[in-house]
Amino acid sequence: MSDKLNILILHRMGDPKTWRASVRDVEFCLPDYAPEHNYIVHNAAMPLPSFVKDIEFHGIVLGPTFLCNRYHPRMLAKTLKEYAFVKESRAFKIAMPQDDYDCSAILERWLLDWDVDLVYTVCPEHWDVLYPNLAATDTLRLGYTGYVSDSMIERWRRPKPFASRTIDVSYRASKLPPNFGTIGYVKGIIGDIFLEKTINEGFRLDISTNQKDIIHGDRWLDFVENSKFILGSNSGSSLLDPEGEIRFAVDKYLVYHP
């Protein structure tokens, strides 16, 4: 009898050219650190091959980008239909959600419906609010939004000398819609504020919240290594939107008032 497990990993990172290294490391943690097993890693941005449904899996992992399908009712309905075999599977199921404050009630119903065995998530002090039903079980485990990989540790053993770095201060973030509250708003404006306050100081800056300036893959690590200082802010949201009602209202408003 083989000791190898058949494991299905579901993510939705889309085009590999746009993957962010830290997200990829979370989604691929099992193939990277337990490569002795048999894996099917499926990008849910692509159609699901029919043969996948015929495999008897020992484990199924629902990655954070796959669970983002909860944000859009039509996408969620399509996901629940197309991946109904996951619900019926006897495999041990693990979910790794992020941004739990966004559509948390929808997410909890989904995880309960699919009989997920373990949920690795953040904010343990708020589990009773985010997951009132799951919190009453032994399902929740502390997880993190990112991890330091072995390859990253090895890379930083000899970082670029401080004096050789060509960027004095850098920053990248997205300007988030209002449904993320004050925390989301501050994350989107601190770069602009810093630029305004230091315009005549002679710093070499690389600060942007423009989507076209997103840095993908390992190029992000190069960017960090070439920066002397990086601006930072709290991540997440200052609003809890369990049913996605705030998100829907904001999206609707912005259509007419961009």
Annotate each predicted stretch with a short phrase.
Residues 3-9, 166-168:
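Residues that mark the start of a beta-strand
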Residues 6-137, 151-156:
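Extended catalytic core of nucleotide-activated donor transferases of GT-like folds
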Residues 18-20, 142, 149-258:
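Conserved catalytic-core segment of nucleotide-activated headgroup transferases in glycan assembly
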Residues 41, 95, 121, 141-146, ...:
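Structural signal for conserved beta-strand scaffold positions within catalytic alpha/beta enzyme cores
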